[in-house]
């Protein structure tokens, strides 16, 4: 595992991939993390941006992508909601993965509903792992 909060994390990624870099990066932080992710992406690699947790805009140019034949695409779940046939198919696949034991939901912490504010604070302060569940 590589900790992206460490200063040299992108070099660790390159070392872990034999100097090549990953073929696919799923990026949801934005800002400098997204920029560093693109720098360590393999030639012909693809980066999917599906969030902006840092609330910062990543900045890169088309030339950066062109020289290494890379692509960056965006994904927003809300936009998928306009395609109910895709959602239905994906939900059925997820259910099959759960039934078949290929997918496990990891619950990191539970909070009573009355402690929802505390749960949100724990998430914001990055004190949680796995899913956080509010119990009614």
Regions found by a protein language model. Give the residues of each.
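C-terminal capping/lid region of NAD(P)-dependent oxidoreductase domains
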Residues: 19, 95, 100-110, 117-136
């Amino acid at each position: 595992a590589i900790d992206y909060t460490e200063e040299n994390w992108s070099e660790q990624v390159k070392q872990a991939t034999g100097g090549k870099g990953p073929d696919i990066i799923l990026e949801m932080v934005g800002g400098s993390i997204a920029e560093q992710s693109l720098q360590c992406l393999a030639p012909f690699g693809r980066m999917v941006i599906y969030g902006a947790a840092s609330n910062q805009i990543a900045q890169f140019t088309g030339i950066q992508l062109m020289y290494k034949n890379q692509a960056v695409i965006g994904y927003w779940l809300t936009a998928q909601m306009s395609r109910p046939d895709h959602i239905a198919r994906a939900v059925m696949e997820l259910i099959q993965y759960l039934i078949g034991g290929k997918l496990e939901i990891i619950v990191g912490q539970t909070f009573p509903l009355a402690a929802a504010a505390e749960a949100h604070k724990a998430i914001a302060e990055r004190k949680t792992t796995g899913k956080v569940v509010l119990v009614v």
